Amino acid sequence: MRKTARGFTLIELLVVIAIIGILSTLAVVALNSARQKSRDSKRVADVKQITTALELYYADANGYPVAATAVELGTGSQVALCTGGWKAACAMGDTTYMGLVPQKPTPNDGSCNSTSTLPSNMYQYTAADNTTYSITFCLGGAVGDLTAGGHTASPSGIQ
């Protein structure tokens, strides 16, 4: 009488390992795509939140905060929007329009880079006078009607 061997052959094990490898690769690719879309959605939501705070500031001060040179929002002395404009922190008695500017999501996405006139991964605010402003930012992929690449938010909306 002959005993039958129990277990898997080497070929069967290699096929199963190959299938698991292919499935895990597909899962990682899908996860990275979802992460990029999430970062881009956060960028658009952040810019909308900043523009809302600027409109509240405008209603009280009859103008927008002036920034003759471009400033990176959310860093250094531009982390809060209070009476008098962008500050490192709001003082007692100041009206706070945005207590903490949203931090930019990382890593960088998109085609905007340091050789471009557009910021790669920041919210860049400029306002030559108090009648208008622009916030430039970059998207790595499409979000709604916005395509990948550089965009500008102003009192008239996001283009």
Question: How would you label these PLM feature ranges?
Answer:
Residues 1-2, 56:
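Short, contiguous, well-ordered secondary-structure segments
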Residues 2-31, 35:
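N-terminal single-pass transmembrane signal-anchor helix
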Residues 28-48:
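Aliphatic-rich helix starts adjacent to a transmembrane/signal segment
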Residues 55-137:
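Extracellular/periplasmic head regions of type IV pilus-like filament subunits
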Residues 127-159:
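Short, surface-exposed interaction loops/tails
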